[in-house]
Design a protein with these regions (language model features):
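Residues forming the flavin
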Residues: 1-255
Length: 255
């Protein structure tokens, strides 16, 4: 089969108190029993086309460990059915491409692994995650979580760390832009009480199995249908499901 590198996104999990997000969205009506837990989806793109956006927002949720290799730390998010946790969380990520990690087929994978291992090191090498208040990150100050009212919910615990040291400068610049811009659009998104936990690297695959545009079969391997997130054709549950439907329809149409 043929492989090709593809753009993906990296960043952090940001957490706010759910009550703050509800107030930012609903104003005086926040807390009304008829209203659902507040959700958000925010994005911005600079003049060069690089994007920063929120992804997989989890109202009343928790930040969970998602590592798949030793000596790495990876964050993800989830909500339970009741969505009644104290915090809201979402991935806050920046798009990256070959200009960031190189043009080799597996250069994106290597970049991803470096970030995940560096997060492991910053977290104290015991699978805690590095975390920092949004306020100290934006002010380039010492990472002090004690001043933030939001308690990080990462399942393995956190360790205060300077998240600037985790990312290259272009990614830090976009994260800073996103925090400031999104806080203007949704008051409380990036206030002094919000916290960030790293590292978020699994929004989509950094590599793609090349498939024929008409048959959807892998180039050089008849009968193999690359599909969904792992194959590089989706970035989330819904888009993976849609891609699966497309593949199924193609197979049905052949027989």
């Amino acid at each position: 089969v043929f492989l090709e590198p593809k753009p993906f996104s990296v960043g952090v999990r940001i957490e706010q108190r759910q009550s703050v997000i509800d107030a930012g969205l609903y104003g005086k009506q926040a807390g009304h029993p008829a209203l659902p837990k507040g959700e958000y989806q925010l994005s911005w793109r600079d003049e060069q086309g690089r994007g920063v956006y929120t992804f997989c927002m989890c109202p009343g949720g928790y930040v969970v460990a998602s590592s798949s290799e030793e000596e790495t730390v990876v964050t993800n998010g989830m909500s339970e059915y009741a969505r009644d946790g104290e915090n809201a969380n979402a991935a806050l990520v920046v798009s990256v491409d070959a200009s960031d990690f190189g043009s080799g087929v597996l250069d994106g994978v290597a970049f991803q692994r470096r970030l995940e291992h560096q997060a492991f090191v910053l977290g104290g090498k015991d699978y805690r995650a590095p975390a920092q208040s949004v306020k100290s990150y934006l002010e380039a100050a010492a990472p002090d979580l004690s001043q933030a009212a939001t308690t990080p919910s990462f399942s393995c615990g956190v360790r205060e760390a300077d998240l600037h040291s985790l990312f290259p400068q272009p990614i830090n610049q976009m994260l800073e832009q996103g925090l400031r811009r999104f806080n203007r659009r949704l008051p409380g998104f990036a206030d002094a009480d919000a916290v960030m936990t790293g590292v978020e690297t699994r929004t989509s695959s950094p590599v793609r199995i090349t498939r024929d545009a008409q048959s959807f079969q892998a180039l050089g391997m008849q009968g193999l249908y690359p599909c969904g997130e792992g194959a590089g054709y989706a970035g989330g549950i819904m888009s993976a499901a849609v891609d699966g439907v497309r593949i199924a329809q193609q197979i049905i149409g052949q027989y």
